[in-house]
């Protein structure tokens, strides 16, 4: 292998897993050429299937510095395809440009469908958060940006809250996307929850009678990037999608909490909006818990008294039973006349049902029609979902395809 990562002067930080990148590309290519512009000279060497075709030689003079590598993937090894997807590569280039502020990356496709993209972001991960939130409604205009370092570990965090109900946290170590999170992400989440609760208490936004906001509460509507540079990262598993260094947690927590506390003190209006958002999430969480409990029925016999006017079938065997969900009483009447009451149940729904994609759980579960469906089918929802409790093995939704 090239061994670049093992020599202390080579890289300040690296992926740190294999240290064999160039060597692997060389071994998997029919040919590979390297042009190194250095010390006023252009050095060149060509390889064929991993073996040098000739010795390293100087082929010219230059006033530039840098390396050009060309390679052709070996179709005998990559039997399915040797075609590169422009969009896949461009997405990764964009990600790297966001993670390394002020770097300029250009990707050009010189094949039949010629295209070229250039990525350069002066705002770095702050611009990344703005990019991710571009189609959302932020509750504070400027993303919060934090950077600092301790014991040789550099920490960068950018975050912005929006009006939505989901959170998106993306963490990176040495430019590697740690999909499964890890210690740096845990440190960030811990600090975020603690700092918001502390600020809320000190400024009397959270009253004595109020419970502390949970991690889920304070992360509702959050988009965040956590990027650290670590000289000796320890990844869990060969895919390096999770960071394992224990010190990464304490350093990320310390750097972020100190800067975020300062930010909240200097921006009381934004702080208020963030805590109000978390408080609403907490109320919704409590309401959803109560609503969920309302949907739990002790037995299937209670279904007959539901407001949804369920006309149940006489069979108690779910394997042959089916339920037809129809629009309104008029459709319900026709369906009841045409059904086989032995195994076909009819559930007429009235009014326009709620759009569950755009509503919070407490709102969804306070909707009579939704509760009727949950109780009639019998499986419950969320963490309590149990498919074996289904009262019908076929659910047929008979509605017209308009907006409601």
From Swiss-Prot:
Cofactors, names only: Mg(2+); Mn(2+); Ca(2+)
Cofactor note: Binds two Mg(2+) per subunit. The magnesium ions form salt bridges with both the protein and the DNA. Can also accept other divalent metal cations, such as Mn(2+) or Ca(2+).
Record localization: Cytoplasm
KW ATP-binding (keyword) present: yes
Disulphides: none
Reaction(s) catalysed by this chain's protein: ATP-dependent breakage, passage and rejoining of double-stranded DNA
InterPro entries tied to this protein: HATPase_C_sf (IPR036890), Ribosomal_Su5_D2-typ_SF (IPR020568), Ribsml_uS5_D2-typ_fold_subgr (IPR014721), Topo_IIA (IPR001241), Topo_IIA-like_dom_sf (IPR013760), Topo_IIA_B (IPR000565), Topo_IIA_B_C (IPR013759), Topo_IIA_bsu_dom2 (IPR013506)
Residues given in the record as Mg(2+) 2 binding sites: 400, 402
Short name of one Pfam family: DNA_gyraseB
Domain Toprim: residue ranges: 321-404
PROSITE patterns, sorted: TOPOISOMERASE_II, TOPRIM
EC number: 5.6.2.2
Enzyme class of the recorded protein, top EC level: isomerase
Miscellaneous information on this protein: Few gyrases are as efficient as E.coli at forming negative supercoils. Not all organisms have 2 type II topoisomerases; in organisms with a single type II topoisomerase this enzyme also has to decatenate newly replicated chromosomes.
Family listed: Belongs to the type II topoisomerase GyrB family.
Record's protein name: DNA gyrase subunit B
């Amino acid at each position: 292998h090239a061994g670049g990562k093992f020599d202390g002067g080579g890289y300040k930080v690296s992926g740190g897993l294999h240290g064999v990148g160039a060597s692997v590309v060389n071994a998997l290519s029919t040919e590979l050429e390297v042009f190194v512009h250095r010390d006023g000279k252009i050095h060149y060497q060509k390889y064929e299937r991993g073996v040098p075709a000739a010795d390293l030689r100087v082929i010219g003079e230059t006033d530039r510095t840098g390396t050009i590598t060309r390679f052709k993937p070996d179709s005998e090894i990559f039997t399915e395809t040797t075609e590169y997807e422009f969009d896949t590569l461009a997405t990764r280039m964009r990600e790297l440009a966001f993670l390394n502020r002020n770097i300029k990356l250009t990707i050009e496709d010189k094949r039949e469908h010629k295209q070229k993209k250039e990525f350069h972001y002066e705002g770095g991960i702050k611009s990344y958060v703005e990019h991710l939130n571009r189609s959302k409604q932020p509750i504070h205009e400027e993303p919060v940006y934090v950077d600092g370092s301790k014991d040789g570990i550099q920490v960068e965090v950018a975050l912005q809250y929006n009006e939505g109900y989901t959170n998106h946290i993306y963490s990176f170590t040495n430019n590697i996307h740690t999909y499964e999170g890890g210690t740096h992400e845990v440190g960030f989440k811990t600090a975020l929850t603690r700092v918001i609760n502390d600020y809320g208490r000190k400024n009397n936004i959270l009253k004595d009678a109020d419970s502390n906001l949970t991690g889920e509460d304070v992360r509702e509507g959050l988009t965040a990037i956590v990027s650290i540079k670590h000289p000796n990262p320890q990844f869990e598993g060969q895919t390096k999608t999770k960071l394992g260094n224990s010190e990464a947690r304490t350093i990320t927590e310390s750097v972020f909490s100190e800067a975020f506390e300062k930010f909240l003190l200097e921006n009381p209006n934004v702080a208020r909006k963030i805590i109000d958002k978390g408080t609403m999430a907490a109320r919704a969480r409590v309401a959803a818990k109560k609503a969920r409990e309302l949907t739990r029925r002790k037995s299937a016999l209670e279904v007959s008294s539901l407001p949804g006017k369920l006309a149940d079938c006489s069979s108690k065997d779910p394997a042959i039973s089916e339920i037809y969900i129809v629009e309104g009483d008029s459709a319900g009447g026709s369906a009841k006349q045409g059904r086989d009451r032995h195994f076909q149940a009819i559930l007429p729904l009235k009014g326009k049902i709620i759009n569950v994609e755009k509503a919070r759980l407490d709102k969804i579960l306070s909707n009579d029609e939704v509760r009727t469906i949950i109780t009639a089918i019998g499986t419950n929802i969320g963490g309590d979902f149990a498919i074996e409790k289904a009262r019908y093995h076929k659910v047929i939704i008979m509605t017209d395809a308009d907006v409601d």
